[in-house]
């Protein structure tokens, strides 16, 4: 069988789903809240300002994909043929000349 992984980045969390590419059946899924979002960092609700840190995107990507795959039958990971990303909107990221997000610099 062949599988695909879908990742959905929302305002406060991200979700990963593993789907059978031939039937469309959902095999497993996982959700994780952005750690820095949950700590209230980079957000100012009084002025409707909500931001995410790039490391949160990486952290939840690693967690949700591994977690979803851990719930699948053995051999699923070796048969993933595609991965797709979805976001709630545009997420501009300021980078240095090498393309590294400024928030990731020491």
Predicted regions: what they are:
Residues 1-104:
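N-terminal glycine/serine-rich phosphate-binding loop of ATP-dependent small-molecule kinases
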């Amino acid at each position: 069988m062949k599988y695909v992984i879908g990742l959905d980045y929302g305002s406060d969390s991200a979700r990963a789903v593993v789907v059978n590419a031939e039937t469309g059946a959902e095999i497993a899924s996982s959700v994780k809240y952005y750690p820095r979002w949950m700590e209230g960092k980079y957000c100012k609700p009084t002025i409707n300002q909500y931001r995410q840190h790039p490391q949160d995107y990486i952290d939840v990507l690693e967690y949700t994909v591994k977690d979803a795959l851990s719930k699948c039958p053995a051999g699923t990971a070796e048969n993933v043929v595609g991965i797709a990303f979805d976001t709630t909107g545009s997420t501009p990221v300021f980078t240095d000349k090498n393309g590294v997000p400024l928030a990731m610099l020491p």
